[in-house]
Each structure stands twice: as structure tokens, then as C-alpha cells.
A protein has these predicted regions:
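Conserved amphipathic alpha-helical segments that form helical-bundle/coiled-coil interaction surfaces
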Residues: 104-184, 195-199, 213-227
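Short linear motifs at protein or domain termini
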Residues: 1-110, 235
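C-terminal effector-binding regulatory domain of bacterial HTH transcription factors
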Residues: 2-3, 211-241
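Short amphipathic alpha-helical interaction/hinge segments
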Residues: 80-83, 182, 186, 226-233, ...
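Short helix-capping and inter-helix turn/linker motifs at the boundaries of alpha-helical repeat units
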Residues: 8, 192-193
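An N-terminal domain-start capping segment
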Residues: 64, 76-82, 145-150, 210-213
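Generic hydrophobic alpha-helical segments
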Residues: 17, 138, 201-202, 206
Length: 241
């Protein structure tokens, strides 16, 4: 491991441990070196190592067993949305991150598809007005960041329009991960224009209370995103290999 300069040391220590997990140097169920050993190896204080370990515990990478030590957790099955985001941002070149990305998008397709159908049946006038306003914000956006924000809020409003509050909660729990992907996807005005057209079709189906067309429209949106993001991450994996 490298020794760190005194800049965001706590974060850097946590990321170094993450990288050892991603690379397979530390495997699920394996015990970490003691805090004293890690501190000596990294050239930092034990208190900073302890804080970094607590951070990694909170998002599901590590677990501490009293009088036994700290171990790599079964993060695939016991992790959190924050852990998933960390995998995507820092571990996108490994197979686990790709697998998790695919699983996340499959889950989102199921969720958005069901919500689109329910929203076509249950959306109120105020729901449709909000969706229309957010679509107008997407049309008017000049910068990718503005567009990404309006896009995220549109899909969050779609969840609420379904009438199922748990769907909206599930979507919100993945906010950080979804925002990350949305920001990576909308990097050009051409993609923004295509997305506006696709969302116009979705809103039209909702206004017409056509569940079948709403389902079709949202699946087109999701599959387009999956294709483009897979291309992006494929390029990154090639560059890092």
C-alpha cells in the first residue's frame, strides 16, 4: 500500500481498503490486519484507520465481531445502496461491479415498468401536471447537469404517480446510484433530445391512461440507457485492462 499525504486521509484509507477488497487481496470472510498494522503500513494514526473501518462498516463492506476482529462482509448479499455506488464509482473495472450494474438495471426495469402501468391507471391531474412541468424542464435544459436533475425528478414523480408509496421509497433509496448513472448518460445534447422524445411518448400514454403504451415507452427509455451505459463501462474496462 501507499502512504498518504495529509489530505482527506480518512477517505483515502477507506478507499485503499475498498481497493484491496475489489482486487481480491481481501476476500469475503477474511480478517483484516489489525488497526495497528494498517496504521503502520499506511503511515497514519490508528484513530484514522478506525474511522475508515467504521465508514466501511456503515455501507456494508466490513463487519466487526467483538473479540475476534474485523472481517470482509458478504457485501453482495448484505450491502447497501451506498456500497453499490462505491462499487460503481471505484470498482467499475471488476466483474462484481459489472454484475451489480446489470442487476440494478434489471431491477429498475421491473420497478419502472410496473410504476408506468399503475401511473397510467392511477395518476391524478396534479401528478400529470407535475410530470408535464418536469418534461418542460428537460426540454428547456441547456446543460447536462440541468437535464439530469429534471430527468431524475421526472422518474421519481412517476413512482409517486403509481399510487404505491413503497415503490417511491425503493426508488428514493437508490437515489445516489441512479443520479450517478444519469449524470454519466446525459453528456451530450443529442442524447438529451432523444430522451425528451422518449419521455414525451411516455407522458402521452399516461395522459391517455394507456397502460400498455406506458409500459412500452418506459422500457424503451430503460433499454436505451442500459445499452449506452454498457458501452461506456466497456470502454472504461478496456482502458484499465
Amino acid at each position: 500500500m501507499q502512504k498518504f499525504e495529509p489530505k482527506s486521509i480518512r477517505t483515502q484509507v477507506a478507499m485503499e481498503i475498498e481497493n484491496r477488497i475489489f482486487s481480491g487481496d481481501l476476500k469475503v470472510g477474511e480478517r483484516l490486519p489489525s488497526e495497528r498494522e494498517l496504521a503502520h503500513e499506511l503511515g497514519v494514526s490508528r484513530s484514522l484507520v478506525n474511522l475508515a473501518i467504521l465508514d466501511l462498516e456503515s455501507i456494508g463492506f466490513l463487519k466487526t465481531i467483538p473479540r475476534q476482529g474485523t472481517f470482509v462482509a458478504d457485501y453482495k448479499n448484505e450491502g447497501t445502496p451506498q456500497m453499490l455506488l462505491s462499487l460503481m464509482v471505484n470498482g467499475v473495472s471488476n466483474n462484481t461491479a459489472v454484475e451489480l450494474f446489470t442487476s440494478l438495471m434489471e431491477t429498475r426495469i421491473l420497478l419502472e415498468n410496473e410504476c408506468a402501468k399503475r401511473a397510467a391507471e392511477n395518476a391524478t391531474d396534479s401528478d400529470l401536471e407535475l410530470l408535464s412541468n418536469l418534461l418542460e424542464q428537460m426540454r428547456a435544459a441547456k446543460e447536462p447537469a440541468q437535464f439530469s436533475e429534471a430527468n431524475f425528478r421526472f422518474h421519481r414523480a412517476l413512482m409517486s404517480a403509481s399510487g404505491n408509496i413503497v415503490y417511491a421509497m425503493i426508488f428514493q433509496s437508490f437515489e445516489l446510484v441512479i443520479r450517478y448513472y444519469v449524470s454519466k448518460y446525459f453528456t451530450s445534447t443529442s442524447r438529451m433530445r432523444v430522451s425528451v422524445s422518449q419521455h414525451e411518448n411516455l407522458l402521452k400514454a399516461l395522459v391517455e391512461h394507456d397502460a400498455s403504451k406506458a409500459s412500452e415507452a418506459v422500457q424503451i427509455i430503460m433499454h436505451e440507457g442500459i445499452t449506452r451505459l454498457n458501452e461506456l463501462f466497456g470502454k472504461k474496462r478496456t482502458q484499465r485492462s
